[in-house]
Each structure stands twice: as structure tokens, then as C-alpha cells.
Amino acid sequence: IPVEDASTTINFPEDGTYYVYARTYNWTSPWSKAKGPGRFILKIDNKRLMPVLGDEGEQWQWQSAGKVSVKAGKSILSLHDLTGFNGRCDAIYMTTDMGKLPPEPKEELEAFRRNMLDLPFEPIESSEYDLVVVGGGIAGICAATAAARLGCKVALVNDRPVLGGNNSSEIRVHLGGTIEVGPNKGLGRMIREFGHSIEGNAQSAENYEDEKKSKMIADEENITLFANCRAIKVEMKGEKIDAVVIKHIETGEEQILSAPLFSDCTGDGTIGYLAGADYRMGREARAEYGEDLAPEKADKMTMGASVQWYSVETSKKSCFPRFNYGI
């Protein structure tokens, strides 16, 4: 089933020819020189701009999407993904000055973006909390709720509009872990309060019952949910985290959340990494912890990535896009 276009209404201040640029990334470029799978195009008032974007280059970059002649007033800008959820687009920039691009260096681009969006140059200081939980997946939901029920004032930061992480309707990995085993018989019991009742990966969105997770958090008076917000940096006092800076993924607004304790539930160890904590990727050698299933020598192998899908009957034929992941 084709992915619906991502669309928004924009207001052109004057008639004219506008040169259009998209900031994109060919995300398979670190391991492949071939054209990437993240191909997309732009449309203005349903008129296609011809260049295909997102499938070349080796870093985030501004790509020309061509030019368009428009009348002053409102228009619909649409991003049409050619392969389904594979495109990468950070920003779209339009100008009547041919060849005038935003800056590329990170600091200069950040200042340019703040100026264009009329954002303050310093993050907003938010309330202090007893605990800041970063990541609104299953681990984050449980950590925030457990602390809140013990009387802690909790901030829960989630970079998506829905809770659940991999178990949300956006990713659709079911809850299949074994719980309540070993010496801690109650461990994992909280999942019963919001877990979905239908098993299976990559099923219909409603199977994952996002509303249960939302209600779970909304019902806890001690939890403040920061939805659509991503932690982008940490502030340190010595070797301890003093605060995290979060950015709203739609508005670009930033806030500072302070607390004596932080729980990294990002799934990628993001907060620990930003704080300079030691980390490793891969599998440790068998001799290090005496695990029978560990390799004899340490290696870089990590969990694989699955391309999951399901099928539905429709009234017309559809095709599966052909593309190359470069592996």
C-alpha cells in the first residue's frame, strides 16, 4: 500500500519563480556507493518537481529540487516517497535568489534555522523534576509509572506522537517477552495494565492498542509527558548529568529539564553516550562473563534488522517498489 504524501500549507509572500532545496541524506552511503533506497520527490499544488531526491551523496546535504513559478498566497507542499518510508528529509527551503543556499556547517545552520523560525537562541528553563525518563517505549512507560507511584515528580520525554516505541502502531513489534520469572516474581507485571491482547508482529495498527499506553500515562498525576520531543544534549556537573536539553521535532523549540536522576530508555543508550559514558557495541568474548553462547572472541555483531510486512486485499493491483539496501 503506497505511503500517503506528507503535506503542509505554505504561504508564498509574492509572485515569482522560487528555487527549491531539500536537505536530505542517502542513509546507505556509509556502506554502499550505489544509489540509495530513500528516493522521494516534492510537489507543489500537486505539480511534481522533477528531480528525484535522497538517493545520492555521503552526508546530510542540500539537494536542488528544481524551480517552480507560483502566485502569491497559499499553496500545498507535498513530499511523495517513492519507495515507502525510506526517504530522509530534514528541511525544505525555497528562495527567489538562484543558488542562495542555507549554510552547511552545523552551528551556522542551527543559527540560520532559529532565525528563520523566529526561535529563541537559548532553551527555555522548565520545572525541576525528581526523575527525567528519556524514551517512551515499554521501558520508559514502566520506569516513569513506577517512579510516579512512589511519589516522584517525573518528566517523560518521547520523540514520537504515540507511546510504546517498538510496540506502538508505528513499529508494530508485539509484547512477547517472558515475565515474572526467577527471584523477582513481580517483575514485569505492570505490562498487564497496558499490554495489547492480540499477538503478532507487523499486524494492523489497532492491534497494538496505543490508547492503553496513552491512558496509562495520562492517569498518573505525577507524570508530565513531553511528546514529540527528542533529547539532543546533556548538561553536566562534574561527572553527573545535571539536565537534558530536549527539542520539539515539529516546532524546533527547546527546553531544559533538570533532575537529580535520569533514566536512559532511548533504546540506543543516547543519554549515556551524550554524557560520555563508556559503551561498547557487539558481543563480548565468552571468557569475560563465562556465557556459554557468547563467541570465543569478541566481535562487532549486533541484532539484525527485519523488514516486516503484512498483506491486505484491495480492489486494485499494487506493486512492490524495487530498491537496493546496498548489502
Model regions and ranges:
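N-terminal Rossmann-fold NAD(P) dinucleotide-binding loop
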Residues: 140
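Conserved beta-strand-loop-beta-strand element in the redox core of flavoprotein oxidoreductases
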Residues: 235-256
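Extracytoplasmic
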Residues: 1-123
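Rossmann-like dinucleotide-binding core of oxidoreductases
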Residues: 271-327
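Beta1/beta-strand and adjacent pyrophosphate-binding region of the FAD-binding site
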Residues: 125-137
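Core beta-strand elements of the Rossmann-like FAD/NAD(P) dinucleotide-binding domain
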Residues: 127-129, 251-261
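Conserved N-terminal/central alpha/beta ligand/cofactor-binding core
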Residues: 146, 152-153, 158-240, 280, ...
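Glycine-/small-residue-rich beta->alpha transition segments that form the dinucleotide
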Residues: 261, 265-270
